[in-house]
Amino acid sequence: MAKISCSSFFVLMLVFSVFSLVEKAKGDERCTIIIHPGSPCDPSDCVQYCYAEYNGVGKCIASKPGRSANCMCTYNC
């Protein structure tokens, strides 16, 4: 009887661990927002504003070659 209880315990722990990992993965979603879309991007301002407002990472990225860069902020949703 002890062998059945021990193996059942380990199976339940394995199932519980898998569900815990799945829930954690769902919570790690990342969002992206364009900050001040019409304004030219200053890299230092972009980084500081994104971190202060969203606790994220800001980068100046041009949507197409030849266009001015926009401040793209990536943060946890």
UniProtKB/Swiss-Prot annotation:
Q: Which residues form a coiled coil?
A: none
The cellular location(s) given in this protein's UniProt record come to: Secreted
Q: Disulfide pairs?
A: 31-77, 41-60, 46-71, 50-73
Keywords from the UniProt entry: Antimicrobial, Disulfide bond, Fungicide, Plant defense, Secreted, Signal
**Which residues are the signal sequence here?**
1-27
**UniProt GO BP:** defense response to fungus; killing of cells of another organism
Q: What is its main location?
A: secreted
Q: Name one Pfam family in it.
A: SLR1-BP
Query: One cellular component GO annotation, for this chain's record?
Result: extracellular region
The family assignment reads: Belongs to the DEFL family.
Protein name as it appears in the record: Putative defensin-like protein 157
Q: From which organism does this entry originate?
A: Arabidopsis thaliana (Mouse-ear cress)
Tell me what gene encodes this. LCR22
